[in-house]
Amino acid sequence: MKALCFEQFGSPDVLQYKEIHDPIINPNEILLRTKAIGLNFADIYRRRGAYHLAGNPPYILGYEGSGIVEQVGTEVTDIAAGDRIAFADVPFANAELVAVPKEKAIPLPDAISFEVASSVLLQGLTAHYLTQDSYKIKAGDFVLVHAAAGGVGQLLIQIIKMKGAHVIGLTSSKEKADAAYSAGTDHVCLYSESWCEEILQITKGHGVDVVYESVGSTLEESFKATKIGGTVVFYGMAGGDPAPIDPRMLMDTSKTLTGGDLWNVLTTYEERKTRSHQLFDWITTGKLHVQNPTTFSLENGADAHRLLESRKSTGKILLIP
């Protein structure tokens, strides 16, 4: 099979598209021929060497995608060759063939395309647990969403509005502000302006109930924009490492800092299936809109990495084998 690999950490230039051995599946796995593969910031971090990678080179990135079953293991009885399957937490996805454990194989309804599934699963499941588990959104809440034009940001906006809350989005450009408004945000502030002050004005001096913080380097400012007793949910650091937070500030202001990691939520097959199918239901009933993705061939994966790193993209980037 063909795969997008790398031998050493570095820039997108280290990525190579080459022939490697097909995966050999275990009895409890299926062999999936991928039709669409999601690109995520975690792939960037791993390519740079910022995240741990198991095994030895050549490394294969990716852990989200969808496709058609080619073969099933001897212990798999409820999945058959030809079935449409998606996955959100399986390694080595940047390849034509992926071995998927049966408990991580999410059945794909006919109404959901491979492109939509690979656009929404990881980011949609992230937005789902952030608004359900990390901080349960209530009607009337004021919510600040960082990187509001990104894939998670646009889905967060829609789910938050679905729950009856007010959304303030943060973006890096007026073009991205348009994407955030299209997703349904009530206000947009730009990183290049005095956004903390703007948010305090919008909230009549109180601050927001919760901040969904995915930039990292803006963590201190996020707390300044949060009301007394409010919450900051830290779930990413696309803009760099955060400055240390003084726990005395948390005590004095009764503010809460909480973290979020999808893998601590998707611990069972039922969790994966139930949460995924709620996303699929929202999409098929028109409650959740998924922006058309930007697609690259798997062979041109380095260009996809460059676009994602540039922070000029909006919505999801997909690799097509």
What is each residue range found by the language model?
Residues 86-147:
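NAD(P)H dinucleotide-binding glycine-rich loop of Rossmann-like/cofactor-binding domains
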Residues 195-205:
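Short amphipathic alpha-helix with an adjacent loop that forms part of the alpha/beta core around
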Residues 218-287, 320-321:
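Glycine-rich phosphate-binding loop and adjacent beta-alpha segment
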Residues 11-14, 19-66:
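N-terminal glycine-rich beta->alpha transition that marks the start or flank
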Residues 120-193, 216:
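Mid-domain Rossmann-like dinucleotide-binding core that forms the NAD(H)/NADP(H) cofactor-binding site
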